[in-house]
Amino acid sequence: MEGLAIGRIVHYSIHESDLKPDQKQHAGEVIAAIIVAVVDDDSMVNLTCFPDWSNNGFFTYNQATPQPLGMFWKTSVKHSQDPEPGKWSWPPRKK
């Protein structure tokens, strides 16, 4: 995919597995992320995600260590043209 590079800012749509059980209503919200690795040429990437969790009222949830987290890492994330939970997309450009 053209434009894929480490350091690019993209959008990540929060998946319900990123959230605590009582916060599933936040699935699909879009947050900022940075590409930290390009996994393949077909647009699969690893991301560091940056939720505005203190203002949005939710915390990301790590299944391995069940505690609130700030930034979080997502591996092997697929691209979506439009925001879709668990996938990344390019930020829209203003015209």
Language-model segment annotations:
Residues 1-2, 13-20:
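Short, charged beta-turn/beta-strand-edge "cap" motif at the junction between a beta-strand
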